[in-house]
Amino acid sequence: MAAAAIAALIYAHLQIAENKRAERRANANELWRETLRLAFDNPKLSDPTLKLAEFDYEERTIDGSIELFQKYELYVDTILNASEEILEVSPTKEWDTAVRIQLKPHRDYLLSFYFQNSGYLEQYGPRFRAFLQKALSDPRHTPPPPNVARIGEPQRKASKRA
C-alpha cells in the first residue's frame, strides 16, 4: 500500500512537471508567433537589410525619426526575449536555426557600439548572451533578399515574352 502511494506521488510530480514544461513551450511558441506578426505588420523594422528605411545606429534614427528608432528597439527586444525563451524551453537545432535567421537582419544593430554599450544585454542570461555572440559572429550570411516590390512605389509590369 505504501509503495502504491509513493508511486502515485511520483507520478503526480512527473505530471505536474510535464504540464509546466508544456505550458512554457506553448507560451514560448505564442511569443514567437507574436514576433512573426510584428514582422509582418512592420516591414521597415523587420529587416533593415531590405533597405525599406534609412537606419542610423549612431544617431539612433530611422528615416530621421527618433520615435521610429525607439519602436525598432522594442521590436528587437521582443525578438530577443522570444528567442531566449524558445531556446530555453526547446533547445533544438531547428529552433537554433530559426532564431539565427530572425536575428541575422539585425546584426548591424546588435553589434553597434550603441547597443553593445547600452546595457540591454544584461537583461539576458549568460547562455543566451553566449548564443547571441556566437550567432552574430557566424560568417554565414542570410541569402540576399529577393527582388521585392517596395512599399509605396508604383509597380512595374512584367514584360511579355515572345
Residue ranges with predicted function:
Residues 1-8:
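Alpha-helical transmembrane segments of integral membrane proteins
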Residues 14-162:
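Amphipathic alpha-helical "stem/stalk" segments
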